């Protein structure tokens, strides 16, 4: 008798992308901005305020000590990856959800039955060449083959076909609204290498991207930008839902 199919093993991730807002925004009298410079200054910070169930499950169950994270600047003029962080404390209850005065207060969470979790991350490095989201979007349109290198400037010849092929399948480009998301090691290393080496500054990739996109491309870009995908009791649609998401999508710096 033929053996039954074994259930597929759950994917285990060791690399992540976490989003924070680098520009000032006041919520309940608190400036919720948090940039890679802020993390460098405080060295270690809790990653609190996540109010999306999928992202929360990553924080609670899957992000482990020494896992590396791409630090992503969100909701700013040039969104993209600006640095590297490392998990130094695994998931524990986000106590800010119990504080009515806190920007990320949730009346349905309590100490006896925590609803939201956070991890602690440590500053690793600031990338000398921040990697724009729009550049990754443009690179994802290239054919993932050796011949694709002919469309790139010599200064970007270090980008491998494997990395280029990983872009279109990356969570960042498929489910860009998640503020905490897993990424494959190849994607992580490729983006980190870009941030360390640069090479696109003189490439007219923005012009090429604009010529291809049109209305459809602009709509697609909007979909991956830039708000955390909130789903506290389900995501609301329309203007009301957008306002609610806007109120919770940031990362707040700890007081020094």
Positions of PLM-derived features:
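Compositionally biased, charged N-terminal/linker segments
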Residues: 1-65, 198-201, 206-210, 216-219, ...
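Eukaryote-biased feature marking scaffold/signaling PDZ-domain proteins and nuclear chromatin regulators
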Residues: 13, 64, 80-82, 114-116
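GIY-YIG nuclease signature motif recognition
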Residues: 18, 85-86, 184
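Short, charged beta-turn/beta-strand-edge "cap" motif at the junction between a beta-strand
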Residues: 72-79
